Amino acid sequence: MAGWSCLVTGAGGFLGQRIVRLLVEEKEVQEIRALDKVFRPELREEFSKLQSKVKLTVLEGDILDEQFLKRACQGASAVIHTASIIDVTNLFNPQVTMNVNVEGTQLLLEACSQASVPIFIYTSSVAVAGPNSYREIIQNGHEEAHLETKWSSPYPYSKKLAEKAVLAANGLPLKNGGTLYTCALRPMFIYGEGSPTLYYLMHEGLNNNGILTHNCKFSRANPVYVGNIAWAHIMALRALRDPKKAPSIQGQFYYISDDTPPQSYDDLTYTLSKKWGFCLDSRMRLPIFLKYWLAFLLEIVSFLLSPIYKYRPPFDRHLVTWQNSVFTFSYKKAQRDMGYEPLFSWEEAKKRTTEWIDALVEPHQEALKTKTL
């Protein structure tokens, strides 16, 4: 399939832009279409420089705009759908999250059907699998266990519904008589340079005398570096374009991790930032079970006030569970079916992320030294 093209939604985001950079290096790619609601000027400039390697078309528009999606998909050979509202703290209006994550995915699938795009790769989330209880322990989980979140919180629920829609669409007929083939990737918590979460935590730490929040002491996860999850999308695309590998991939979901050591989310943040004197908050915290039931009470208050006031609790039971669970997964199935191997080692991922944090923190170096003395 010489001269193929690929549409990447969410291409202005943390993960999407990394996928675009890798796609540029793929053989025989004729065009990359980068779609997002808005692109930062510096990213637009970077993408324009990539034009020397391949045709790169920037498309600004709404994932809920049906006509826009149909135009974006016209003539494309594959779609990588990363566009999503990622919101575990419920900052967004729940209906907006559901609309973007579920309806947006359904509209894009329909656009692929009408434009006869044969390959659709969806960026799902480990959140679609749980954890459902902070007492639940999943270590080296795998796809055959068919774990599924029971939470109705907008983010995990919307991602679950969207993934189901994508996998159910596998095998559907296209307008030109062809067939749509789909798969979904479930990344762990994604870290790396440009991470919105790390950016927020670093600035919060700078404003808090070099002290990092310590909410996830009892968690154990295996975070994945952004360069490796981006690479997994490339491997999935190659596999779905390969007649020998494609039958094993079609309609499947895959957990994507790498060789980052299992650790708590707090420990990861500390490891990446400790050279600047950041430290974890040592103050006593509420026991998990008390925080869980406090979250339940806050959810009840939010529900009771909803007719007259939109109160959004600072945390809910899903977030408390997420922050305090043992929940790790293996990437062996992706390794077996699509040949995925992490492109970056833990040491390289740590080095790259730390250098990015250095650039964030360095302008505040003197103030940070004073605060941490």
UniProtKB/Swiss-Prot annotation:
Binding-site residues, NAD(+): 159
Membrane spanning residue stretches: 288-308
Gene3D superfamilies: NAD(P)-binding Rossmann-like Domain
Biochemical pathway: Lipid metabolism; steroid biosynthesis
Annotated membrane topology: Single-pass membrane protein
Catalysed reactions listed for this entry: a 3beta-hydroxy-Delta(5)-steroid + NAD(+) = a 3-oxo-Delta(5)-steroid + NADH + H(+); a 3-oxo-Delta(5)-steroid = a 3-oxo-Delta(4)-steroid
Subcellular location: Endoplasmic reticulum membrane; Mitochondrion membrane
Active site (record annotation): 155
GO function terms (MF aspect): 3-beta-hydroxy-Delta5-steroid dehydrogenase (NAD+) activity; oxidoreductase activity, acting on the CH-OH group of donors, NAD or NADP as acceptor; steroid Delta-isomerase activity
Keywords: Endoplasmic reticulum, Isomerase, Membrane, Mitochondrion, Multifunctional enzyme, NAD, Oxidoreductase, Steroidogenesis, Transmembrane, Transmembrane helix
InterPro entries: 3Beta_OHSteriod_DH/Estase, Lipid_A_modif_metabolic_enz, NAD(P)-bd_dom_sf
GO biological process, one term: C21-steroid hormone metabolic process
GO cellular component, as recorded: cytoplasm; endoplasmic reticulum membrane; intracellular membrane-bounded organelle; mitochondrial membrane
EC number: 1.1.1.145, 5.3.3.1
Any Pfam family hit: 3Beta_HSD
Role, per record: 3-beta-HSD is a bifunctional enzyme, that catalyzes the oxidative conversion of Delta(5)-ene-3-beta-hydroxy steroid, and the oxidative conversion of ketosteroids. The 3-beta-HSD enzymatic system plays a crucial role in the biosynthesis of all classes of hormonal steroids.
Family the UniProt entry places it in: Belongs to the 3-beta-HSD family.
Descriptive protein name: 3 beta-hydroxysteroid dehydrogenase/Delta 5-->4-isomerase
Organism: Equus caballus (Horse)
